[in-house]
């Protein structure tokens, strides 16, 4: 499909700089064949803090469990599915925790190296540092707290065909976004030509929006916005969006025909083969029950709900639209709705 059919508005100028900006949508497939191009992935896992929230005190955002796997492992799986086998993960003081979690997650991650930005470098600085010594023709950078459901191959095609220095994935409700009036919301996914990073300072905090893009404009380099439908990239920015992402992932799994290793499907629910769920338990909607968990008699699980490993749901309890992490115990007759219960949490019995 030709770019003009997909909504590319070539030559739309930036009034301030005069640089070329184009718009491409995420539907369909490009005719450009990037075979033979070496592509390297960069995951930006050193995300900004939420503030002094409860979840932040428990775990860094890329390690939040989504379907009982770290959020960042879903990002890495997306890169691997798109054909990227080498990834550099950029983190901060959470590097050791992320390395340990990914080693135990059992997910389909590509080969990973780590870059620890002890001093804050910002996203552009981290990407430049991660690319040092790389022979890649293309760099795909993605935040570590998103779940993309877009065709990575088509995104790379669009970037290469446009000869852009930088491509930003944005979400828009319009089929053909108007860059001047509706530029779309950035989704935390970028495709770089390596030479676009030449002007990024090797020291200090370097941002993409505030520093790199204006610099590319000044140099007359082309920037492409690649528009995808709203909801095709799920971002986790806080507790509410975390619950929404967990529910989205479970609903998406339920609607797909894919199998999940170690789990058996019961209606809309997924039960681990080592989980013990009493026959009298009522399952309503998509429910995900992890390894070695026990759900006792006459309980009710209403989806979308995820239950981690080694949890115990005592008799007559009700768990609805919630995310329970590992080792949680819910007392007999307790009622949970729209809740997050962290590792080893205890919910007392109900009346």
Where are the model-predicted features located?
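Generic beta-sheet signal
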Residues: 44, 66, 90, 117, ...
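Glycine-rich hexapeptide-repeat left-handed beta-helix
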Residues: 3, 10-19, 23, 46, ...
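Catalytic-core segments of class I nucleotidyltransferases/pyrophosphorylases
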Residues: 138-140, 147-148, 153-160, 167, ...
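Conserved beta-loop-beta/alpha segment of the NTase-like Rossmann-fold superfamily
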Residues: 89, 96-179
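Extended, small-residue-rich solenoid/repeat segments and analogous flexible loops
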Residues: 217-311, 318
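N-terminal glycine-rich phosphate-binding loop and ensuing alpha1 helix
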Residues: 2-4, 10, 14-99, 110
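Well-ordered alpha-helical segments embedded in enzymatic catalytic cores
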Residues: 71-75, 125-129, 212
